[in-house]
């Protein structure tokens, strides 16, 4: 695993880059042999950039996430041999997601503030990438359907308001 974060070289800019490599196999439950589980992506990476624009009291955030294609399997039972076998297998397409958010903090810097609102606009999967998480198979294994999110893109517009305790950093850091 690799991780790099920098908050010091550019004023009000925080960014990090991470990369993970995973090479694993398991002999588990009904697996015919030791195989890579369907939840294990060999390569994952992310890039996150957060910039606070003091003049307009706004935090601008971008994040990009990547995961290489994970394996999928349709493991069937053969009653004639009393063994399991691969009826279908392969790799799902690589996962890509670019997200963006704006956080407006009108109370930041105000003395004796009693209310701390954070107004948020957040868009996940800005480029509308098709994200396939796996496949479902019919009982007889003859048909497979993609497991996809109900919507390719998600837009959130909202406000987080705390009274008495300043939780603006919490709202910003948990938004990405």
Enumerate the predicted regions with their spans.
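Residues embedded in well-ordered secondary-structure elements
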Residues: 6, 38, 51, 89-91, ...
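Residues that define the transmembrane beta-barrel architecture of outer-membrane proteins
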Residues: 39-45, 94-98, 115-117, 151-155
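Short, well-ordered amphipathic alpha-helices
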Residues: 1-3, 47-49, 99-107, 159-160
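Extracellular loop and loop/strand-boundary signature of outer-membrane beta-barrel proteins
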Residues: 27-36, 85-90, 142-147
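Extracytoplasmic gating/loop element in the C-terminal half of outer-membrane beta-barrel translocons
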Residues: 59-99, 103-105, 109
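Flexible, solvent-exposed coil segments and beta strand-coil junctions
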Residues: 22-30, 76-84, 135-140
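C-terminal beta-signal and adjacent terminal beta-strands/loops
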Residues: 66-78, 104-176
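Gram-negative outer-membrane beta-barrel transporters
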Residues: 1-74
């Amino acid at each position: 695993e690799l991780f790099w974060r920098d908050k010091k070289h550019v004023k009000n800019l925080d960014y990090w880059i991470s990369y993970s490599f995973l090479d694993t196999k398991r002999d588990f439950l009904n697996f015919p042999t030791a195989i890579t589980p369907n939840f294990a992506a060999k390569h994952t990476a992310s890039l996150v950039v957060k910039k606070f624009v003091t003049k307009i009291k706004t935090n601008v955030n971008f994040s990009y996430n990547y995961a290489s294609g994970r394996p999928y399997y349709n493991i069937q039972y053969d009653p004639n041999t009393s063994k399991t076998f691969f009826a279908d297998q392969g790799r799902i397409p690589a996962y890509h997601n670019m997200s963006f958010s704006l956080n407006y903090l009108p109370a930041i810097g105000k003395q004796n503030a009693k209310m701390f609102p954070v107004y948020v606009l957040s868009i996940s999967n800005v480029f509308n990438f098709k994200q396939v998480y796996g496949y479902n198979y019919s009982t007889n294994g003859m048909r497979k359907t993609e497991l996809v999110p109900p919507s390719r893109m998600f837009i959130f517009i909202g406000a987080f308001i705390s009274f008495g305790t300043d939780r603006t950093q919490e709202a910003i850091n948990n938004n990405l």
